[in-house]
């Protein structure tokens, strides 16, 4: 079935909120929100311009009758260990096959703790 071969793309940019400075070399992870366990959809690092792109397929999120992911992102430091920012409070319910984000992170969240 053609729908089963459909690819989903989440892309966007990450910048410092106060200055608009692109934030490169951060880890971006995409998730599908579910009732029990959230599905990991993929991850990548931002480039020097703060841009990222993650591709995934319906098999990565499909449970029961789910036809579209309930999408959120988590942004980590370059090592992928410290959570800096997440969009879980603004989940994109039934996300489209092509979602674009502009993520603005406060400078205070970027400072090592």
Which residues fall in each region the model found?
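Beta-strand-dominated extracellular/periplasmic modules and repeats
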Residues: 2-112
């Amino acid at each position: 079935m053609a729908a089963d071969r459909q690819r989903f793309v989440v892309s966007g940019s990450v910048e410092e909120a106060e200055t608009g400075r692109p934030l490169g070399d951060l880890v971006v992870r995409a998730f599908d929100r579910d009732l029990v366990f959230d599905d990991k959809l993929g991850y990548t690092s931002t480039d020097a311009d703060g841009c990222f792109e993650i591709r995934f397929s319906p098999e990565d999120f499909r449970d029961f009758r789910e036809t579209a992911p309930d999408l959120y992102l988590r942004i980590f430091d370059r090592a992928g260990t410290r959570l800096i920012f997440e969009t879980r409070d603004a989940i994109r319910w039934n996300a489209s096959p092509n979602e674009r984000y502009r993520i603005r992170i406060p400078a205070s969240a970027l400072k090592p703790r």
